Design a protein with these regions (language model features):
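Extracellular jelly-roll beta-sandwich "head" domains, especially the C-terminal globular C1q domain
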Residues: 1-133
Length: 133
């Protein structure tokens, strides 16, 4: 079993609508060939488990709930949803994501994306790390 890692970061503010994919920015660190950045998605390829850890900071366009979820191949990963509440417009809300996903034999690459699932916001900071165990 080989280890691979990718870490991305984005500090450029971006307006994201509900159900919009959050821009991951650029690669900060990368090792191995099982994880790669493809647009605003991380592609993972190779049988095994992948630990996904990330933090998204948003400034909601309205007071109330805001949520971020990890999607794998356009399907929400049930254990990877973070929700916070903004007391006022523009409050910083930090949303942590931490989970493990499994890549099985012979599927080809899987695509991982962070999606804003509730509360249109300006995303001000994103850090995402995916590591093959």
């Amino acid at each position: 079993m080989s280890r691979s890692l990718i870490q991305t970061t984005n500090t450029t503010p971006a307006a994201v609508a509900v159900n919009g994919i959050i821009p991951l920015g650029s690669v900060l660190r990368r090792f191995g060939c099982n994880c790669r950045l493809n647009g605003n998605n991380i592609e993972v390829e190779g049988t095994g488990y992948y630990t996904v850890e990330g933090t998204v900071t948003v400034q909601p366009a309205a007071a109330g709930a805001v949520s971020v979820a990890l999607f794998e191949n356009n399907v929400a990963v049930p254990s990877a949803v973070a929700t916070g509440t903004a007391a006022a417009i523009g409050d910083d809300v930090t949303l942590p994501i931490s989970t493990t996903v499994r890549e099985t034999c012979c599927e080809g690459a899987s695509s991982l994306a962070l999606v804003l699932t509730d509360g249109a916001s300006t995303v001000t900071n994103v850090s995402l790390r995916v590591e093959k165990e």
